[in-house]
Amino acid sequence: MADWFSASEHPAALPSQRTWRIVSTVTIALSLWASPSLAKDPFRTASPHAIGDKTEAAFRSIFEQGNYKNAASALSQAESGEPLAFALKASLAYSNWQGESDQSKKQAASDSFKGYATQTRESAEQLLKTDPLRGNLYLAVGNFLEGAYVVSTQGVIRGTPQALGKLQQAFKYLDEAEKIDAKDPELNLLKGYIDLLLAVNVSLPLSSPTQAIERLEKYASPRYLAYRGLALGYRDLNQPDKALQAINQAIAAAPKNPELSYLKAQILVRQGNNKEGIALFEKALSQKDQLPSGIVSQIQRELARTQRRVQNVGR
């Protein structure tokens, strides 16, 4: 996905970019509950959760293949009342919202995002009755998404008090989930991403990057998403060698995803390897038809900036 998860640069991130990181990270982590009812649970060796084939297809399209268009098609047929499906729809709506220039379409995407965020929370409230762990996790996601909407529409200064309230609620639900099973792979994947996101991007004493990395290394699954989270974290912690090792592991597990090429390109550029970075930016753009326009624009901007840097050095 975009920004923090899929790669927009961290140091000078705009408030809207930070919000997209939160949306992307939350959705990714939660979308990992995407095992269809008759398929193997990607996190557990026993007691798989019944979620649905269409939701599973959407999850794999986004996070294994980086194919958002196929994901949108699957989500149009997704199982009713499934919180994960609503969270994924929210993520796609946010991507359209941020990438749209037509104001009427932009407003429609904003409204869709708000609606799906609310549906994520409300369906999680129902799930809480039968599956407390996942119910609490999705309640956390719903609150995160609703907080992201507030900041995006009201701005950082006006929206922060309400968004902080949503953030506190989200952590309360995550804590409840952790009481049920502190080593649950879904929980640790989600908390690993969120804690790392907040630790490196937001000046709040809510998260520890060390603990987040430990969660991703020890307990999170599936591994290719854990490696991706580690690559993002090490990138933003200015540890490019470790970031490169992690992204290589992610690519080995999910080689068709153009967003992984994009992230590796960023890491290589930070190491000063502009030539290989440019090649990977271009590789990611060769699959631009399956990516949201906002992500494509980000890649194009970073490619152009890197090309200018190379040209200036050669003068």
Regions found by a protein language model. Give the residues of each.
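Terminal, low-structured helical/coil segments at or just beyond the last alpha-helical repeat
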Residues: 2-4, 40-47, 236-237, 270-315
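TPR/TPR-like (Sel1-like) alpha-helical repeat modules
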Residues: 79, 168-172, 208-210, 214, ...
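Alpha-solenoid helical repeat scaffolds
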Residues: 87-91, 137-139, 186-190, 224-232, ...
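Short coil turns that delineate tetratricopeptide repeat
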Residues: 76, 80-83, 129-132, 182, ...
